[in-house]
Amino acid sequence: MKKMIGIVLVLTLALGLAACGGGDETGGEQKPSMISVVSREEGSGTRGAFIELAGIEEKDAAGNKVDRTSEMAEISNSTSVVMATVMGNKRAIGYISLGSMNDDVKALAIDGADATVDNIKSGAYSIARPFHLATLGAASPAAADFLAFAMSAQGQAVVEESGYISAAAGGDYKPSGTAGQVRIAGSSSVTPVMEKLKEAYVGLNPSADIQIQQSDSTTGMTSAIEGICDIGMASRNLKDSELEAGLEPVVLAMDGIAVIVNRENPVSAMTLDQVRSVFIGETTDWNEIGE
């Protein structure tokens, strides 16, 4: 009897090993099955731009805009959290500022176009949006000088070096030696390039005090309206209500929105229609995504 049990166990183990090895013999990577959608929070400029550009935002019968992001989506409150979530989950898909991309995650080609600066400039990659800086009326002398640097040839060179698309060919900036404080707040997508601009600006004006507070686009615009900050950052176009409140925007740069997956996910490309279907919860399995 013991001998018979032993034989059964050996056969069971052998069959299990054969089943495990069967996938390796195909030589192909296996898709990770169920899709885990990762989205930014409401108020995020990246989310606002993404749902508009990907067709996730629609109008209802009354003409009101409706965000159809899946209720099953995992909500993240910053670019870095989205990246960390996707990096740690083979089934995940999310979206981030192209300028924040690194080798920890993989950006998908959309409609046959890779997410690159050149493809955004040519229009081949369609998921792109502006970075705005906004002040309430006339900026303070210190804030105005910082903005002058950001839009200058030197400032726009920093924008390009940081992986974004410059907004304009500005003139030469001459250091003012300003010692004033400038409070900047808003989008987590705009923050990285603003940190680079701050570093370059302070290098030219060592006595300047530039403070940057990361949150989201809506918070940044509200902070500028309420006088909590001198300059608000938004990774989307300003809303009518924000313009009516007196905000005066300027386009700092253009940026793509990269649709990202885990590096171990074999999927490398999707159509924009597939992206929409995934993020509204119609497509829920990676095996439904054909390449």
Language model: regions and residue ranges:
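Exported/periplasmic ABC-transporter solute-binding proteins
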Residues: 4, 20-291
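C-terminal motif of bacterial Sec signal peptides marking the signal peptidase cleavage site
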Residues: 15-19
